[in-house]
């Protein structure tokens, strides 16, 4: 106990006030303002530079991104403010085990580029629900999946990131939580609505650089404050809150805090769950989530997509060092606030009786860093928040527009699709803000645990349907649909039980049903996956096999099938959705109106544009990327939606060797920290 109190700790007027009289000074605010201006400048530059007046240009950045902005965007989209707050908070509460998610992600992001992406490119798909529609036929799977993705985005991504970023800004500027959220969204929504995916990727590249510089700086200050890694390992176990009851184990650091692999029955992250149960949601996130896949599809070719995945995989080594370890340092320096164990005390400290570990990272920034660097770290947190939100907004609007709206209105003009996509972003924002109070009260005050629990209940069935669709040619629509429905039904039941039977505080008896109390969410992930695979297999074998058109170019074994040339269909005759599942480059599904503005629709809507328009109308058209469209403009020639899967042999070999090195690096980290 003496070691923890002897650590450098700023004087506090009230030991339970987490941020006493501590707010940003003029120098910090100047850095933050400069950051906002810089991001807006980059966002507006990319808005002007890139082609935003087509659906492909808006949703796929024109398909001409090189490897480094793709890799930076993959990392920035993954590491949002929820990561900074959540990983540091879980590190403070339970140790390094949460870093297993990051090391696991190294394998999954490589699987995306080397295994799944060639299938998506060969099948000429641009959204994940569209892949299932082409692979299995029909529309019920794609619609179910589109609705599920939007649900997951709202309840585990957007609201979590907004809450995490708002915690930081609320504590540093002493603003109301919701006012903080609205202020952040104003800038975020502006360049997402205006610029599309290109603006998102370019600003992500900038924000990745800012995140890394700021986070590495704070890591240096953190380790210096406790005497390096040796000091951290020694003092962490002495970081106890002063008001803890001597007869209680509440508030004690875990004995296995510095181990990734933990007891299979009694620990917070059992090792079988880490090895198997964790890999399944990770596979869903990196290989089938629209937010991530959309960035890789925007690459100019498969080699650039692989380069982006390699860059993201190497960057995934860093969160343990720049987030988890600093969170543990925060517990050492500020045990009474970060490690509070009494609900009344926690309520007083952070307005959350479940626990205050989520203030670990903001606490470090505001108490440890000098003026100027505090402003830089504020910029880092805002960068993390904005990069995640813009990515999710763009991908969610892509799914809604291309998979749901296009199903309802298959003949919708390109102009209509562009407007619908942008309006949906605004609707997403509203729903997500309303969900924040539920996030605030969930999972014992550990934000990252909340995210992973919901992921383990909803994502495994989807992941298994994708895996079977990609690697088992016999899987058919009936098997995939009923496997998905049964898996999601079980997942939603467990999710509802978790919200009804909230985990009790440390000193209270646990009277929850055994299925909630004794079945860890990672084990439940394994159960869901097994049920889904069994259902898909049995139903597929009992029903008719899929046609050749549903397999060609859409599985790993058929991705290189020869393309069957078909007669050109006149542009004025749109293909109905029923003819859209042959899987070739010429297969125009309802959602692939990315290639041309249909001549008939163009003429029908040309009368809407009057020769003279007010300045307000012209400004709105520019914001939506639809300015200056001539009514006499000839239809654009058809262009391939996605790149080829062919690669330069030398570049391919170089990438493969680099991939093996990255895998060896991941295995070393697993072994060293296991």
From Swiss-Prot:
<feature type="transmembrane region" description="Helical">
    <location>
        <begin position="209"/>
        <end position="229"/>
    </location>
</feature>
<feature type="transmembrane region" description="Helical">
    <location>
        <begin position="28"/>
        <end position="48"/>
    </location>
</feature>
<keyword id="KW-1133">Transmembrane helix</keyword>
<feature type="topological domain" description="Cytoplasmic">
    <location>
        <begin position="543"/>
        <end position="653"/>
    </location>
</feature>
<comment type="function">
    <text>Involved in the sodium-dependent cotransport of myo-inositol (MI) with a Na(+):MI stoichiometry of 2:1. Exclusively responsible for apical MI transport and absorption in intestine. Can also transport D-chiro-inositol (DCI) but not L-fucose. Exhibits stereospecific cotransport of both D-glucose and D-xylose. May induce apoptosis through the TNF-alpha, PDCD1 pathway. May play a role in the regulation of MI concentration in serum, involving reabsorption in at least the proximal tubule of the kidney.</text>
</comment>
<feature type="topological domain" description="Cytoplasmic">
    <location>
        <begin position="49"/>
        <end position="56"/>
    </location>
</feature>
<keyword id="KW-0813">Transport</keyword>
<feature type="transmembrane region" description="Helical">
    <location>
        <begin position="522"/>
        <end position="542"/>
    </location>
</feature>
<feature type="transmembrane region" description="Helical">
    <location>
        <begin position="480"/>
        <end position="500"/>
    </location>
</feature>
<comment type="similarity">
    <text>Belongs to the sodium:solute symporter (SSF) (TC 2.A.21) family.</text>
</comment>
<feature type="topological domain" description="Extracellular">
    <location>
        <begin position="330"/>
        <end position="375"/>
    </location>
</feature>
<dbReference type="GO" id="GO:0005886">
    <property type="term" value="C:plasma membrane"/>
</dbReference>
<keyword id="KW-0472">Membrane</keyword>
<feature type="transmembrane region" description="Helical">
    <location>
        <begin position="419"/>
        <end position="439"/>
    </location>
</feature>
<feature type="topological domain" description="Extracellular">
    <location>
        <begin position="501"/>
        <end position="521"/>
    </location>
</feature>
<keyword id="KW-0739">Sodium transport</keyword>
<feature type="topological domain" description="Extracellular">
    <location>
        <begin position="1"/>
        <end position="27"/>
    </location>
</feature>
<feature type="topological domain" description="Cytoplasmic">
    <location>
        <begin position="468"/>
        <end position="479"/>
    </location>
</feature>
<feature type="transmembrane region" description="Helical">
    <location>
        <begin position="141"/>
        <end position="161"/>
    </location>
</feature>
<dbReference type="Pfam" id="PF00474">
    <property type="entry name" value="SSF"/>
</dbReference>
<protein>
    <recommendedName>
        <fullName>Sodium/myo-inositol cotransporter 2</fullName>
    </recommendedName>
</protein>
<feature type="transmembrane region" description="Helical">
    <location>
        <begin position="57"/>
        <end position="77"/>
    </location>
</feature>
<feature type="transmembrane region" description="Helical">
    <location>
        <begin position="181"/>
        <end position="201"/>
    </location>
</feature>
<dbReference type="GO" id="GO:0016324">
    <property type="term" value="C:apical plasma membrane"/>
</dbReference>
<dbReference type="GO" id="GO:0005412">
    <property type="term" value="F:D-glucose:sodium symporter activity"/>
</dbReference>
<keyword id="KW-0812">Transmembrane</keyword>
<keyword id="KW-0762">Sugar transport</keyword>
<dbReference type="InterPro" id="IPR038377">
    <property type="entry name" value="Na/Glc_symporter_sf"/>
</dbReference>
<feature type="topological domain" description="Extracellular">
    <location>
        <begin position="230"/>
        <end position="272"/>
    </location>
</feature>
<feature type="transmembrane region" description="Helical">
    <location>
        <begin position="654"/>
        <end position="674"/>
    </location>
</feature>
<feature type="topological domain" description="Extracellular">
    <location>
        <begin position="78"/>
        <end position="102"/>
    </location>
</feature>
<feature type="topological domain" description="Cytoplasmic">
    <location>
        <begin position="202"/>
        <end position="208"/>
    </location>
</feature>
<dbReference type="GO" id="GO:0005365">
    <property type="term" value="F:myo-inositol transmembrane transporter activity"/>
</dbReference>
<keyword id="KW-0915">Sodium</keyword>
<feature type="topological domain" description="Cytoplasmic">
    <location>
        <begin position="397"/>
        <end position="418"/>
    </location>
</feature>
<keyword id="KW-0053">Apoptosis</keyword>
<keyword id="KW-0406">Ion transport</keyword>
<feature type="transmembrane region" description="Helical">
    <location>
        <begin position="103"/>
        <end position="123"/>
    </location>
</feature>
<dbReference type="GO" id="GO:0006915">
    <property type="term" value="P:apoptotic process"/>
</dbReference>
<feature type="transmembrane region" description="Helical">
    <location>
        <begin position="273"/>
        <end position="293"/>
    </location>
</feature>
<feature type="transmembrane region" description="Helical">
    <location>
        <begin position="309"/>
        <end position="329"/>
    </location>
</feature>
<feature type="transmembrane region" description="Helical">
    <location>
        <begin position="376"/>
        <end position="396"/>
    </location>
</feature>
